Amino acid sequence: MAGGKGGKGGKGGKGGKVGGAKNKKTPQSRSYKAGLQFPVGRIHRFLKGRVSAKNRVGATAAVYAAAILEYLTAEVLELAGNASKDFKVRRITPRHLLLAIRGDEELDILIKATIAGGGVIPHIHKALLGKHSTKNRSSAKTAEPR
């Protein structure tokens, strides 16, 4: 039995607790593995709840959906942060979110929701502005006195 696989001790055998703890890995979330902040497991659960009982949801579908949601959220927050800096405040309000979304052409098409407390985008139609330009007003003022 010297040098064989039988018996106790030695290297590589099936003996007791030797080497068993080394193979244990700490559990890693799917969000951590994908390098995301959004919860992949929760999104997978929501996706499974949305499809019918016959259909299945692949594991990578949840990762892909979480990545898309995280990217869009980061994009909106970056634009809203820029809007809050323009107003010289440190807190992002619903108004800043609305200005960020409506100011970006692609996000405006994507997000059609009404944001509570966001207000409206100021816009005056060209037909309502009047036909007088700055040149006409200055020449009209100089021509008036008689």
Swiss-Prot record:
GO terms for cellular component: nucleosome; nucleus. It is found in: Nucleus; Chromosome. The modification N6-acetyllysine is found at residues 5, 8, 11, 14, 17, 22. Its main location: nucleus. Residues 1-19 have a biased composition (Gly residues). Transmembrane segments: none annotated. GO terms for molecular function: DNA binding; protein heterodimerization activity; structural constituent of chromatin. CDD domains: HFD_H2A. Phosphorylated on the C-terminal half. Keywords: Acetylation, Chromosome, DNA-binding, Nucleosome core, Nucleus, Phosphoprotein. Residues 1-31 are annotated as: Disordered. The nucleosome is a histone octamer containing two molecules each of H2A, H2B, H3 and H4 assembled in one H3-H4 heterotetramer and two H2A-H2B heterodimers. The octamer wraps approximately 147 bp of DNA. H2A or its variant HTA3 forms a heterodimer with H2B. Belongs to the histone H2A family. Variant histone H2A which replaces conventional H2A in a subset of nucleosomes, preferentially in transcriptionally active chromatin. Nucleosomes wrap and compact DNA into chromatin, limiting DNA accessibility to the cellular machineries which require DNA as a template. Histones thereby play a central role in transcription regulation, DNA repair, DNA replication and chromosomal stability. DNA accessibility is regulated via a complex set of post-translational modifications of histones, also called histone code, and nucleosome remodeling. Essential for vegetative growth. This is Histone H2A.Z. The lineage of its organism: Eukaryota, Sar, Alveolata, Ciliophora, Intramacronucleata. The gene is HTA3.
